[in-house]
Amino acid sequence: MSSIKPAAKKLRLAKAGKQNRRVPMFVIAKTGGKVRTHTKMRNWRRNTLKK
């Protein structure tokens, strides 16, 4: 991808990068290990973002 990109695309990529985090440890501890993953985890190679 080019380094020069539209602002809207840059914002979308930044938001997707922030959302792509694991479940916090305190949530795993609070739920007794029942909640370990969330469905919005995305791998840059496997899943694509909407244009």
UniProtKB/Swiss-Prot annotation:
Keyword Ribosomal protein applies: yes
Example GO molecular function: structural constituent of ribosome
GO cellular component, one term: ribosome
The name this protein goes by in its record: Large ribosomal subunit protein eL39
NCBIfam families the UniProt entry points to: PRK01242.1
Single GO biological process annotation from the record: translation
Tree of life domain: Archaea
Family: Belongs to the eukaryotic ribosomal protein eL39 family.
Pfam family, one: Ribosomal_L39
InterPro entries found in the cross-reference section: Ribosomal_eL39, Ribosomal_eL39_CS, Ribosomal_eL39_dom_sf
